[in-house]
Amino acid sequence: MSHNDKNTHNYQISSLDKIINDSSVAIEFENVYFAYTEERMILKNVSFTINDNEYVCVIGHNGSGKSTISKVLTGLLKPKSGVIKLFGIEISAANLKYLRNNIGIVFQNPDNQFVGITAEDDIAFGLENRKVPPNKMWDIINDAAVATGIEDLLKKESLELSGGQKQRVAIASVLAINPKVIIFDESTSMLDPKGKNELKELMVSLRDVAKKTIISITHDMEEVVKADKVIVMSNGEVQYIGTPQEIFANEERLLKMQLDIPFTLKLAKTLKEKGLKIDLTLNNEELIEKICKN
């Protein structure tokens, strides 16, 4: 690359940085279609918007297309047609490598994403790939470990960690490279109840404290309760978009799409039908308080 080409490249990156930092909209899908073959369309005319610093759950039955959304967003798959924008910038082959720096992803199986010998090595891996100077690495690793509650696990090897702890290491590895968007692709599905609850709380903290945009692709209705927005997928199409309260208000509609409502809401409905004076709620503590007052 010549000196002039390098200056032009740096200017382009600087311009993209400004657009990203100034944008209040994190992600836009506009009429996106995707198919592995002509016979079967996986995504059909998918359109939605996710704001910066928003926690969004994408739900749907198996085969609904929800996981394909993360793959086309990260450039692992190329849409057949339509536009995908990240912070106002249309994703293309020319800028994909740069834009990927602003997206982190945590997968379903924690064992498949542990690449280092120890937790500390695993977090350092992404930093080494980005040529972060060794003298700056420790502070970044420590900050990511503190944010995910694994500062006491940094010297532990993979075999010494539980599934939930490995997922926290994976999240710390993502946080260390400081993306603006973090995608959780069925990240709680292989965890025990304790690990699931801890990860759900961490997602909320990443939105509230770290100011990240969180996208969780999930079939766990208990997780959806804490989201700002829910996108419901079925047969490759967006069926509904709304708050958790709006989405769960129509149980019959969800059941037709092979989805359920959270246990707390289900219990509140049952108690209300049995005569208790209880308003329907998605909040456990609120339900307990109302039961105690009856």
From Swiss-Prot:
Its main location: membrane. It is found in: Cell membrane. It comes from the Bacteria. Its EC number is 7.-.-.-. InterPro entries: AAA+_ATPase, ABC_transporter-like_ATP-bd, ABC_transporter-like_CS, ABC_transpr_CbiO/EcfA_su, ECF_ABC_transporter_ATP-bd, EcfA_1, P-loop_NTPase. PROSITE patterns: ABC_TRANSPORTER_1, ABC_TRANSPORTER_2, CBIO. ATP binds at residues 60-67. It is a peripheral membrane protein. Keywords: ATP-binding, Cell membrane, Membrane, Nucleotide-binding, Translocase, Transport. Residues 27-260 form the ABC transporter domain. Belongs to the ABC transporter superfamily. Energy-coupling factor EcfA family. NCBIfam families: ECF_ATPase_1, PRK13648.1. This is Energy-coupling factor transporter ATP-binding protein EcfA1. It comes from Ureaplasma parvum serovar 3 (strain ATCC 700970).
